């Protein structure tokens, strides 16, 4: 019946897409309505399914029934004017298919086809089962992050974790934005394999993001081509890391390290021609067999091409591994199209503002950084385009988001002992070497503003951002200064107006809102791990990408300006292109980054199936903290303490739990049972089962001194056993 249920779900999704796409009472192109409908159907429909599942449980009837209910709910507001809605769809199709729009239709079709092919190839390679039954990831970042997503997904689908408790930290409610994984759990409930359930929404939303960026560019006056280039930059844009391959090719040809530097070329101009020729000779071979990651991702600092690389290729740092940002970013793009169109429509358009508020209101369950970023961007746009509808967006957002926000605000925000307090103030983000990050307060914020101003005045700050993101920040700053100075008299004002004439005015307003996000993210860190502010910088980068795309399209027909701007755009994309080339088949196996990375062996898969079949769904397990622990990722069970790195980054207040977990895992040696603290701790944490794995050198293991032999001699009943791990029933302790 799996194919039947999945087909029914697909048909209901199409119905929901058409119904949701008919909600906005504003002038939209047909491709915009389809994309808006698809994103609203996924995001809001998933929340509706979750709310119903809280009452009725997660099963096939609930999944399909909630999808049908969502489609009906989307249709109710416009049903009485269905003739008008049908006419708008027909008019939209006629406009798209008209002869004078043929080029636009071809552009939309080619972009959609390219995006579908790209993301289908990448995401179907992200996770899968080989002929031997091993579950493998195709990328290291996917191996790491999707282990968490598998855990959350299967905690819903297999262990029926409703209302949701944190499967990585027993006894704590789930504060991680879980709706993306819950939506995948609904697909597992319908019969999809967990890997497919994670991959399918990823393909859909990734394609939607590419098309929505292009549609937004058209809406802002830049054109489809500018939008496609902006989407490419958002996916693969980076900094100057590509220069590292020039140095490697130079060294590979036999030149000295001194000769293979810019200063060396300047100091020995007579050798320049030979060095350049030798470098170019060896460059193709180095491109085909790259010895390191030139974006610095998962690379020790000593091997990174440039010092302090923190901006990695977005495709592999965010879009593939971090599923929540796909849901959040697609929702944000829909919000931008809705509010920009509604604010400039000359009509009340309150429904569109309300729909935007609904999407923002569910973001605390999906991607909290999107809510933060869009609050900043919308505040800037509201000042530029005054409209009463902004208040509707704000009120709806506040009402829908309030319950979840209250939970998050009241929850733990790390601890001083674990060095994971958040939010904190970090002027200039990660450009400096200082690790001091005071907790957010009025005093620290005031000091942080001063620190940021001082940072901006240093060459080190600009060197950091240019090395990491190339021309993106300088371009944004030039446009911002031009916008501020264009009304000034004299040469300064004239020069500013010439700069502004290169960009559509509406696009500049959106880019300035995105630049405001950059400023805030350069001051306040919103999670324990400061690198996670890249989830905010992604929205600044959208504005920078739109500016660069618009500039290229505007100037590319002019010879010298076109050549210059093409070179600038290429410099932003070169590092990402190198990273993508490294995935191709000709890369030597020792330098390959395309996996496989084993998430679970065939034996682990069997053990997980035994655990799921023979233990209560709400049982608590003592595990060794591996990110890819099969008891968590495949059986969906709850751990006393899962992977420490994730929990730390979420701002978990651990208390004594880490030390207690160590004590339990290491056993009591020859100590008498009456004096052994393990059994008291098992009772304290209400542990039902203990999983002991002899692969104590695996990545992420919390305590490598696990006493495998001690646990084997305690006489506990064995629930499941594999090649390396054993699960003991300790309820009779």
Residue ranges of predicted features:
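Perimembrane helix-loop-helix junctions
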Residues: 339, 343-350, 356, 360, ...
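Alpha-helical transmembrane segments at the extracellular/periplasmic loop-to-helix junctions
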Residues: 2-15, 106-117, 144-147, 307-308, ...
